[in-house]
Amino acid sequence: MAEDLILERCDLQLEVNGRDHRTADLCRERLVLRRGQPFWLTLHFEGRGYEAGVDTLTFNAVTGPDPSEEAGTMARFSLSSAVEGGTWSASAVDQQDSTVSLLLSTPADAPIGLYRLSLEASTGYQGSSFVLGHFILLYNPRCPADAVYMDSDQERQEYVLTQQGFIYQGSAKFINGIPWNFGQFEDGILDICLMLLDTNPKFLKNAGQDCSRRSRPVYVGRVVSAMVNCNDDQGVLQGRWDNNYSDGVSPMSWIGSVDILRRWKDYGCQRVKYGQCWVFAAVACTVLRCLGIPTRVVTNFNSAHDQNSNLLIEYFRNESGEIEGNKSEMIWNFHCWVESWMTRPDLEPGYEGWQALDPTPQEKSEGTYCCGPVPVRAIKEGHLNVKYDAPFVFAEVNADVVNWIRQKDGSLRKSINHLVVGLKISTKSVGRDEREDITHTYKYPEGSEEEREAFVRANHLNKLATKEEAQEETGVAMRIRVGQNMTMGSDFDIFAYITNGTAESHECQLLLCARIVSYNGVLGPVCSTNDLLNLTLDPFSENSIPLHILYEKYGDYLTESNLIKVRGLLIEPAANSYVLAERDIYLENPEIKIRVLGEPKQNRKLIAEVSLKNPLPVPLLGCIFTVEGAGLTKDQKSVEVPDPVEAGEQAKVRVDLLPTEVGLHKLVVNFECDKLKAVKGYRNVIIGPA
């Protein structure tokens, strides 16, 4: 009788499997695999080798605290002649003496997570068990049978493997891309993402069921959407919008997700202070990409927060055009969420592809502060009965704005604007540092028959109010125009551009006002206004009325959003009519310049020289540069400028870098001081092999 088969050791083939599964950055010390794709193991036995027909090798793969075959969290499979796609299987490919090379496969719908792999080796009636090791299983966008399959290699590279990108802010008229370090493959991030799943209330309530459902990206996306905010659970980020961040970090100061996720872990899964929409979205993007789900951050400019799902944002204004009363429904200058790519087997066919998920805590969904996933196609078609949260997302990009302006006699005059909400919906382009406009994926062209049909469906299914017609045109129109030099620290002019398209004169009065505004629409102090101007608009005339805005009036009050709202109200008393025009102005920050000193080689020290010219008429105090970059820095680094920086002078520091990864990387920089906040910059750095 043959002696027992004794395993000496198991080689998990980290390098080969990491390369094949596109997990090399994660496979330095443990095995990380993508489901539905074969992987290699090498078994080294003591004494004699494996003999087919004499020895039986049986494998066990388990995940979660309560594994079961019925739940799909435990699999038992024996060595076969060839690996079988779509199931757990193993095959001996090569044998040299007492060493055997194995190819194993996993199902494309297996639950993701941490697995323990063990071996039962039996000879006759005797046998022994051995733990081969642990591996982490992720979603696989390269596997056609996986729910997250994406057929474009360029898109897979961008939406799963790329660790840096841009998030778009500012206003619809001036879009500003800020660099962000997602860092999904940085040290410890994968473990933190798995910890996040194991901290969610559904896992704590029924761990076995939760682990089983991790086979479905729809489920995991919804869990991540809830766990990135802390409103119902031990989530990652606490939101705050009141510009008081002294006991935490200002949302505008973050430059990457890595520091946030590491803080959450180091704090014992206690909330990190503070986040706003783009921070929530960026952290969700990091987690979902890390787990293997193709994901991108999306910005919607002029985004509606419609609480009662009537597709109307109503503003009640006084005679000067200032908003009064309840401000719970607002138009945000911009709002960010994420889109993830997946099939929707829980819905009828046709809803696969990009799904919107919003981790910013706004409204509850099925009792939890989360939103989505909802198919972007459902939003475009007005299919508001499709899971999850379609009415809320539809309103964000399609609501109408109704202005009620109080007249001198106390009556209210109404106007509707159909064209304000859901503009310039933006994301980073694939493979390029440029913005891609994806508005067409959410909305049909304004005024098209397809748009009308989508609104008919939305109004019918959600029992929404019928759209009302805009007030009758008077032939007088007004727009807010901007001048040149719209930069932080400058004095500048804006203009009320008024046209009379009729053959008659119009006697009008004009009010112009500029106020500080936060990105979520909350108004601050007035920084410029004019007295009531009496105007005579000649037939077919054009008029341009300036309003001067001084740094000394806005500098101490501007929020980190760098936004000023200009409002013009043109009143024609004789016709009892008015024209309201508003525009949000973004003040551009100074440029951060980055020079890389030294030869950019792997594991060779580099120096980054980072500088910024003071654009203000006053000195800058407490200047500090913070830098980070996946593959360039192990941790975030901050360097202070010891002396005040006078007007027109340079703030300059040098930062040591030690690149660990070959290829293209982004060094992301944030600058802060007493007068300038959240100034961002970046530099692409190509690292060559040592």
Swiss-Prot record:
PROSITE patterns: TRANSGLUTAMINASES. The keyword Transcription regulation does not apply. The modification N6-acetyllysine is found at K467. One of its GO terms (biological process) is regulation of apoptotic process. Disulfide bonds join C230-C370, C370-C371. Disulfide bond formation inactivates the calcium-dependent acyltransferase activity. Cys-370 can form disulfide bonds with both Cys-230 and Cys-371: formation of a disulfide bond between Cys-230 and Cys-370 facilitates formation of the disulfide between Cys-370 and Cys-371, which promotes inactivation of the acyltransferase activity. May also form interchain disulfids between Cys-230 and Cys-370. Ca(2+) protects against disulfide bond formation and inactivation. Ca(2+) binds at N398, D400, E436, E446, E451, E542. Its EC number is 2.3.2.13, 3.4.-.-, 3.5.1.44, 2.3.1.-. InterPro entries: Ig-like_fold, Ig_E-set, Papain-like_cys_pep_sf, Transglutaminase, Transglutaminase-like, Transglutaminase-like_sf, Transglutaminase_animal, Transglutaminase_AS. The keyword Membrane applies. It is found in: Cytoplasm, Cytosol; Nucleus; Chromosome; Secreted, Extracellular space, Extracellular matrix. GTP binds at R479, I480, R481, V482, G483, Q484, N485, M486, R583, D584, I585, Y586. Acyltransferase activity is regulated by the binding of GTP and Ca(2+): inactivated by GTP, which stabilizes its closed structure, thereby obstructing the accessibility of substrates to the active sites. In contrast, Ca(2+) acts as a cofactor by inducing conformational change to the active open form. In absence of Ca(2+), Mg(2+) may bind Ca(2+)-binding sites, promoting GTP-binding and subsequent inhibition of the acyltransferase activity. Extracellularly reduced and activated by CLIC3. Gene3D superfamilies: Immunoglobulins, Transglutaminase-like. Calcium-dependent acyltransferase that catalyzes the formation of covalent bonds between peptide-bound glutamine and various primary amines, such as gamma-amino group of peptide-bound lysine, or mono- and polyamines, thereby producing cross-linked or aminated proteins, respectively. Involved in many biological processes, such as bone development, angiogenesis, wound healing, cellular differentiation, chromatin modification and apoptosis. This is Protein-glutamine gamma-glutamyltransferase 2. It comes from Cavia cutleri (Guinea pig).
